[in-house]
Design a protein with these regions (language model features):
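A domain-level signal for the structural core that forms small-molecule/cofactor-binding pockets
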Residues: 2-75
Length: 75
């Protein structure tokens, strides 16, 4: 605990994904008061053509209480 799942378009290098996971781990541990060893991070790539159906419509749009909302829409 805690577990973070990041979804993004394809195209990031493995090095970028590792760096992202490291930085997210530091931020989570620092702000939530847990050890870095308690944090897990998963990065899933979603094709841009699938983003609206797989992510926006199912995981972003229905959530009224997102702590950070995106600055875009998929209308």
């Amino acid at each position: 605990m805690p577990h973070v799942e990041i979804k993004c378009f394809p195209g990031r290098t493995e090095e970028q994904k590792i760096k992202c996971a490291e930085e997210v781990t530091k931020a989570i541990a620092g702000t939530m008061g847990c050890n870095e060893s308690s944090v897990s991070v998963d990065i899933k790539e979603v094709a841009q053509d699938d983003w609206k159906d797989q992510v926006w419509d199912k995981e972003i749009l229905p959530l009224e209480n997102l702590y950070k909302k995106p600055g875009y829409t998929c209308e």
